[in-house]
């Protein structure tokens, strides 16, 4: 039995990863920032699995909390990340990059060598974007750490509790018969179900041959943004016209909302990302891990229900 520290255990990916690890007879140490986050972890798990979970309070932003969190641990799966901020990228760098560096330093000091890191597809080519810069630099820090690392780089994730698809669903709910898409709606994505990512994370942990490798992961089909929006409408049973809107216009509205601290579905940095392709090898999951991930068609029924608010460890 491997004892695995999971950072971001209370977030979207963590909520699917913990049952995957526990079902394979691993013991989990869930790193949580607060008692509230810990309660969220335990509420989601069936009673028969709780005995194999230990909650430890800590935060990658607070290096002094990481050494106690690593005590008795064999490996780490690092999920913590944020996808937006309103500080010109400073918070993204603080959490995504500095938090990863803090974890690496703590692992080096404690002697825990095995690290599976959740990266993001396409960020190496997008360092002009705040999110891309923070994630690309974090991935480089992992690769240069001297630890026994594996990096998984997924495209958009879907599944109960997700960020992106629920945002599109909210736009559909709020729209008066039309749904805006940024630009021409032709940017391409390769949506991957979060449960399939969780399986890839577990298999990475268990297979020594994955050490020293980074894997680009996506679903079995490429979708344009416009096609994704249409599929969300179908899943929700809503008829909507899909209308392209120039990215500069949406950025203007988003920037104005950010300036006065009004809620807006996406930040300006995220809008720039949505106008760019986010695809990898179409058989990336099968080539690396030996299974075919599920298709998105028919899997979005959860969008009929409004999601609960996610915490700051959410990977959007």
Regions found by a protein language model. Give the residues of each.
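Rossmann-fold NAD(P)-dependent oxidoreductase module
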Residues: 16, 20, 106, 141, ...
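NAD(P)H-binding glycine-rich loop region in Rossmannoid oxidoreductase-like domains
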Residues: 47-102, 106, 121-125
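N-terminal Rossmann NAD(P)H-binding glycine-rich loop of SDR-like oxidoreductase domains
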Residues: 4-26
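N-terminal Rossmann-fold cofactor-binding loop
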Residues: 31-36, 59-60
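Flexible, glycine-rich beta-alpha linker
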Residues: 127-129, 150-169, 188, 223
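Mid/C-terminal beta-alpha module of Rossmann-like enzyme folds, strongest
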Residues: 203-269, 280-316
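A conserved pocket-lining segment of Rossmann-fold NAD(P)-dependent short-chain dehydrogenase/reductase
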Residues: 170-192, 196, 200-211, 216
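Conserved Rossmann-fold NAD(P)-dependent oxidoreductase catalytic core, especially the SDR/UDP-sugar
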Residues: 82, 90-145, 150-152
């Amino acid at each position: 039995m491997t004892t695995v520290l999971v950072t971001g255990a209370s977030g979207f990916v963590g909520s699917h990863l913990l049952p995957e690890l526990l079902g394979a007879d691993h013991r989990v140490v869930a790193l949580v920032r607060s008692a509230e986050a810990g309660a969220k972890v335990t509420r989601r798990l069936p009673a028969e699995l709780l005995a194999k979970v230990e909650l430890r309070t800590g935060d990658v932003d607070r290096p002094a909390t990481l050494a106690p969190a690593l005590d008795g641990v064999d490996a780490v799966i690092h999920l913590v990340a944020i996808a937006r901020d309103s500080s010109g990228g400073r918070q993204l760098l603080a959490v995504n990059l500095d938090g990863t560096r803090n974890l690496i330093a703590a692992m080096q000091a404690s002697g825990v060598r095995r690290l599976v890191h959740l990266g993001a597809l396409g960020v190496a080519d997008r360092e002009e974007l705040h999110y891309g810069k923070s994630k690309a630099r974090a991935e480089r820090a992992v690769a240069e750490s001297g630890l026994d690392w594996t990096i998984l780089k997924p495209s958009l994730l879907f599944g109960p509790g997700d960020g992106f698809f629920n945002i599109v669903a909210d736009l559909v709910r709020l729209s008066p018969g039309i749904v805006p898409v940024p630009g021409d709606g032709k940017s391409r994505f390769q949506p991957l179900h979060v449960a399939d990512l969780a399986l890839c994370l577990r298999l990475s942990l268990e297979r020594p041959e994955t050490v020293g490798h980074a894997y680009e992961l996506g679903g079995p089909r490429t979708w344009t943004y416009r096609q994704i929006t249409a599929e969300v409408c179908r899943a929700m049973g809503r008829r909507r016209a899909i209308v392209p809107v120039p990215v500069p216009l949406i950025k203007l509205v988003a920037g104005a909302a950010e300036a006065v601290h009004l809620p807006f579905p996406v930040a300006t940095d995220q809008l720039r990302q949505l106008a760019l392709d986010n695809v990898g090898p179409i058989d990336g999951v099968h080539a690396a891990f030996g299974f075919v991930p599920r298709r998105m068609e028919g899997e979005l029924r959860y969008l009929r229900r409004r999601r609960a608010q996610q915490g700051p460890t959410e990977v959007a």
